[in-house]
Amino acid sequence: MTMMKRIFLLFAAVVMAAGVASAQDINKAIEAANNGNEAFQMGEYGLAIDAFKNSLAIAESLGEQGVEHANTCKTAICNIYLAFSKNLIKAADLDAALAKLSETISVSEGYGNAETAESAKELIPQVYMQKGNTALKAKDMAGAIEAYNKVIELDPNNGDALLRLGQAYAASGQFESAVASYETAAANGKELAAKKQLSTLFLKKAQASLKAGNNQEVIENALKANSYLENANAYKLAASAAQKLKNNAQCIEFYEKYLELKPNAKDAAGVTFTIAALYQQDGNKAKAIENYEKVAADPQYGPGAQEQLAVLKK
């Protein structure tokens, strides 16, 4: 049932109550309620609330005879407050919407209307989520973090808010907070998306470590990235770092995983040639031959591979 129909029916109840009170007073109450209903239909929520509050005051002055009328007005007032809040949300006037929802809850609880109060409470996390999304899109990470944290405060298991909070933390350089948010999101229905973000996060950290010359950290972060979601580029970074550390076994392992995940990579021939050379350095003749043969016909690496094959096959 639409809000307009609900208000109309409530107004009808007001009219039905007219016969039990003094004609003059009840007519004033009906007129005020009618004005409120008309204002509501025109979207003049503030005027509608004032009119129904006026009608309520008249009803309450009638004592026992005005109880039904008063209850009708209270229900109408609560519903108008909620409709006002929803209209502000629709208009993306989110701060005003939050303030109006707070009023809705206060008024509804004061009038004993638990249902409307609960409806308003359910909307608050949605409004904060909308605020967070708007801030994230505008690259206002501080605003996004604040809004998403409010969502989580009200709805701790909201996987979407946790995931986007992780994105905001990551974009603002708050690495540990981003990891914590993503991991909590993964535990709340967003496992695939969260693990993808975690893998990317640690891959970027591995890239930063490579630029800083911290090769052991490169390997650690690349492997951490792959613990969430295997990524060919993470293995390539780890292989590069292992080669600089002169750890041939690790370098071979990582390069082989890289080619396993990305067999048609543009640098596949070069990586295969490197693997062959590393096996050759380690004295593994069979593996060296196997890999040199893979690139023996390559325009760039073929001549070098054939030269080494001639040596190895003597």
Residue ranges with predicted function:
Residues 41, 79, 83, 87-90, ...:
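Register position in tetratricopeptide repeats
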Residues 197, 204-216, 220, 266-269, ...:
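Terminal, low-structured helical/coil segments at or just beyond the last alpha-helical repeat
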Residues 68-69, 73-76, 83, 123, ...:
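Canonical tetratricopeptide repeat
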Residues 60, 109, 156, 189-190, ...:
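Short coil turns that delineate tetratricopeptide repeat
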Residues 65-66, 113-114, 120, 161, ...:
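TPR alpha-solenoid repeat register
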Residues 55, 104, 150-151, 184-185, ...:
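Canonical positions in the second alpha-helix
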